[in-house]
Amino acid sequence: MKALAKLERAPGLTLTRVKRPEVGHNDVLIKIRRTAICGTDIHIWKWDDWAQKTIPVPMHVGHEYVGEIVEMGQEVRGFAIGDRVSGEGHITCGFCRNCRAGRRHLCRNTVGVGVNREGAFAEYLAIPAFNAFKIPPEISDDLASIFDPFGNATHTALSFNLVGEDVLITGAGPIGIMAVAIAKHVGARNVVITDINDYRLELARKMGATRAVNVARESLRDVMAELRMTEGFDVGLEMSGVPSAFTSLLEAMNHGGKVALLGIPPAQTAIDWNQVIFKGLEIKGIYGREMFETWYKMVAMLQSGLDLSPIVTHRFAVDDYEKGFAAMLSGESGKVILDWTA
């Protein structure tokens, strides 16, 4: 089958032919329709330090997808041939303390699709049926293919009650931008997002941001004054992994505020703990999606009017994958979709 793989320990990916995956007793085989390019895939493309330490070579990658079930293992229940599905990209052990307590997103033995094992940038993907998630007919293939990052945004944004709250989001990547739409959808008052990328800040405005602030040119404090915010933000969502952004977020938080961290900062990043301790801040680390509460919330929000369509900005046939990666690398894109049926 056709697949997009890392064949050499060097930058780039190669469109190649690989063996179609075998289907275990508890697996489903998915014929891929659409995939989306993730920031993780950009790390793999660049072959940075993280990728060199993490990614087996050779291996086809990718973990954001939608497709239909074409084969099932003999022990699979609850699915049928032809079901349209996406899937949870974190495959968990089922036996550790957290898995057995129903907290699978905290499994200490997590294996990542397209990171630690063969991925979705291929014509077919085999995954445990437990990880497959049926997509309702009213949700498009494009949106279904980005449920993985949409889930990151949902898990982060809904970590705390947002109704009537003032929310600061640092980092206007696709996940941060989707968090804007989620926060407004569930009833936040002011939703302010910061970055230095004008293209993505404009996308955030389209998705409902109260203010999208280029911090290279505009003061966050001035924006807070403009919005008549006298005490700081109630909820902070750190999506960038940039130390200076995290610092500014902590400084802008109100006393008793709550902070969720999805962005991954460099090791040994300095924190002004006075901001945390004397403000009584609550800080929560976010990894992946809650299984499968996050997934049900994503569907419910889309069915109740959440519009994420502006976040998909580029679409390419898989044979033009290099154009798709170029769009992502340019910084002037939202989500980039690769069509495996074209």
UniProtKB/Swiss-Prot annotation:
Zn(2+) 1 binds at residues 38, 63-64. Signal peptide: none annotated. The active site is at residues 40, 43. The record marks 148 as: Important for catalytic activity for the proton relay mechanism but does not participate directly in the coordination of zinc atom. Keywords: Cytoplasm, Metal-binding, NAD, Oxidoreductase, Zinc. Its cofactor is Zn(2+). SUPFAM superfamilies: GroES-like, NAD(P)-binding Rossmann-fold domains. It comes from the Bacteria. NAD(+) binds at residues 175, 195, 200, 262-264, 286-287. Binds 2 Zn(2+) ions per subunit. Pathway: Amino-acid degradation; L-threonine degradation via oxydo-reductase pathway; glycine from L-threonine: step 1/2. GO terms for biological process: L-threonine catabolic process to glycine. It is found in: Cytoplasm. One of its GO terms (molecular function) is zinc ion binding. Zn(2+) 2 binds at residues 93, 96, 99, 107. It catalyses: L-threonine + NAD(+) = (2S)-2-amino-3-oxobutanoate + NADH + H(+). Homotetramer. Belongs to the zinc-containing alcohol dehydrogenase family. Catalyzes the NAD(+)-dependent oxidation of L-threonine to 2-amino-3-ketobutyrate. This is L-threonine 3-dehydrogenase. The gene is tdh.
